[in-house]
Design a protein with these regions (language model features):
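Primary detection of the long, small/polar-rich alpha-helical "axial" segments characteristic
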Residues: 1-288
Length: 288
């Protein structure tokens, strides 16, 4: 290598290597301090794009899980209310069976019928007043649509819970009658004599079947939502793990990189200092 004064190639090379080691040291320190392997797009452009898409999915699925849990709550509220109505109908049936007995006097049947009417009105109030977040559950013609996925695919990411309008259910309506609208009126079905009581028994049996069918539907919906939540939790876990492998810093590897960069930094500083002294050797030639 020729000896020159104006251009110190050895020093330039040492400075370039020192700059590289400084950059490596800065990168290692940034990753260790932030906990992230990718702190900007320049660190891993493709990886950042993939990780951000995964992050979008994870956030969407997290919200979808909350939506599904709302569905579970709605089904629980609806099923609980129907359970209460079912108990009221069972008591009404007991009263009808008791009233159908020929040993009852007219005053006995009037007393039985008064309780029967009160229970009918309470059943109507419960059915009409059961709400979830202000929305009627058992007295609505509008299906409840739940967003249970992170995307907009209607077949995969949405679940429709079919509306239940008890007022339109002939089996239940035949028991409650005119109390459907007000909750305080006199029901069409009464137990003031044996024939009416026997008719009431048959009508209530049919109404109880309708109540139980809808309770079973709510139970099935609840189970489905629970499975959706469980599957979503697994998906979130896997997506988060995949994103972590791209974005998160490996502390063992980064600590090793930091130590290496520190050593190179110290060695580079020493070599630059020595390289800057090389032009001084030209003076020995001039003195000769």
């Amino acid at each position: 290598m020729p000896q020159t004064i104006n251009t110190n190639l050895v020093s330039l090379n040492a400075q370039r290597n020192l700059s590289m080691s400084q950059s490596q040291l800065g990168t290692a320190m940034q990753r260790l301090s932030s906990g992230m392997r990718v702190n900007s797009a320049k660190d891993d452009a493709a990886g950042l794009a993939i990780a951000e898409r995964m992050n979008t999915q994870v956030k969407g699925m997290t919200v979808a899980m909350r939506n599904a849990n709302d569905g579970i709550s709605l089904a629980q509220v609806g099923e609980g209310a129907l359970g209460s109505v079912g108990s009221l109908f069972q008591r009404m049936r007991e009263l009808a069976v008791q009233s159908a007995n020929g040993t009852n006097s007219s005053s006995d049947r009037i007393s039985l019928n008064q309780e029967f009417i009160q229970l009918s009105q309470e059943a109507t109030r419960t059915l009409g007043g059961t709400k979830f977040n202000g929305l009627g559950i058992l007295a609505t013609t509008n299906d409840a649509i739940f967003q249970i996925g992170a995307n907009s695919n209607s077949d995969v990411d949405r679940l429709t819970v079919t509306a239940f309008d008890w007022a339109a259910n002939t089996s239940i309506n035949s028991v409650l009658g005119s109390t459907v609208l007000s909750g305080t009126g006199t029901p069409t079905l009464q137990i003031t004599d044996t024939p009416n009581a026997q008719s009431a028994i048959s009508a209530i049996d049919t109404a109880i079947d309708a109540i139980n069918a809808q309770r079973a539907n709510f139970g099935a919906v609840q189970n489905r939502f629970e499975n959706i939540v469980n599957n979503m939790q697994v998906a979130v876990e896997n997506q988060s793990a995949a994103r972590s492998r791209i974005m998160d810093a490996d502390y063992a590897a980064e600590t090793s990189a930091l130590s290496r960069a520190n050593i190179l930094q110290q060695a580079g500083n020493a070599m630059v200092a020595q390289a800057n002294q090389l032009p001084q050797q030209v003076l020995s030639l001039l003195k000769g």
